[in-house]
């Protein structure tokens, strides 16, 4: 029996200099699993609650000492003695302990830290890599990365409305080559921006964050960088957007300050997207509508859902019950998976399974506030998700996930699969 003997949480810092939790779970064999919890900037209102202390005299109110205490004084007592390989049972025990819909008593950050640390300890005990422990013997697909190379919106202090402009090296033969292509385009983009006199400082997720003349100019400079790096847009490299539209939505109107006609209805916003899709090799749009604008989501899905990937992030918040409703109404065709939106590994896996059964694609994602924890890289391979979104090609908090995927690809050797364009199995290409 892989019995839990001790659980310990501490307060650490994330990539934005804000506190977060790190949890260690110890087993009777002496092995230990450690996990750190990420944090988002643009968050869905139905996400599980990230518990913060609110003491303005300490870390500007963002401390997590209460969540740490909840792990050390409440959760630890309840799960000590349980078998670490009983992931479902341990996660269920923590949900019962919390007893609230959005994990507001103990905090999703407290619960998730324990959930992931338990899985890591169990994998160590069994003697297999984390991706294999979670996914079994068929975990073998390396994900196509969505690389965020221009940051805007809530992720950057600039005038760009759209939060993320991403490249997807779908023409690569394997993950290692995809990463190389992305890095080369990233450096080419820096050169392009410098040549135009733009600032090349980076945002929260490592992408460049210049002030640009329009949102479309971001696409133009990326296209130029792809060609400068020696690749063919639309064949070897595709584009993806995360609009984070909930941040732009108020009183039934979307406001894009950097557009000539800044105020847009849902219909006008769909027209705006369709125009971009017709002009550029955009294969994916995330959060194209606000999380509560389900009518807008339906219009977007009906118009573009057969041509491109329509990803729900704030819309679904990795919540199986919300996803189920979206599937029933024909909303979106893909889900973004963020571990801390729902708060346990078990519920995350439930959401992924539900999405796949409905023919939705899954994109495993980081948060804008990250740590050196690489769990999501293992998760992407464990569930054969096919896609991962973990930032740009700089900042260790982003690059560590890519480096972990390189290790996994090496370990899998000739068993490893990389599907490139084929990951978009539910749209016409």
Curated annotation (Swiss-Prot):
Co-factor(s): Mg(2+)
Binding site for Mg(2+): 242, 286, 313
Pfam families assigned to the protein according to its UniProt record, in alphabetical order: Enolase_C, Enolase_N
EC code(s) of this entry: 4.2.1.11
Cofactor binding remark: Binds a second Mg(2+) ion via substrate during catalysis.
Catalytic residue list: 205 (proton donor), 338 (proton acceptor)
Keywords: Cytoplasm, Glycolysis, Lyase, Magnesium, Metal-binding, Secreted
First-listed, main subcellular location of the protein, grouped into a coarse class: cytoplasm
Pathway: Carbohydrate degradation; glycolysis; pyruvate from D-glyceraldehyde 3-phosphate: step 4/5
GO molecular function: magnesium ion binding; phosphopyruvate hydratase activity
Reactions catalysed according to its record: (2R)-2-phosphoglycerate = phosphoenolpyruvate + H2O
Cell location: Cytoplasm; Secreted; Cell surface
Listed GO biological process terms: glycolytic process
Binding site for (2R)-2-phosphoglycerate: 163, 338, 367-368, 389
Top-level class of the enzyme under EC nomenclature: lyase
InterPro entries per UniProt: Enolase, Enolase-like_C_sf, Enolase-like_N, Enolase_C, Enolase_CS, Enolase_N
NCBIfam families: eno
Job description of the protein: Catalyzes the reversible conversion of 2-phosphoglycerate (2-PG) into phosphoenolpyruvate (PEP). It is essential for the degradation of carbohydrates via glycolysis.
The name this protein goes by in its record: Enolase
Organism of origin: Citrifermentans bemidjiense (strain ATCC BAA-1014 / DSM 16622 / JCM 12645 / Bem) (Geobacter bemidjiensis)
Source organism phylogeny: Bacteria, Pseudomonadati, Thermodesulfobacteriota, Desulfuromonadia, Geobacterales
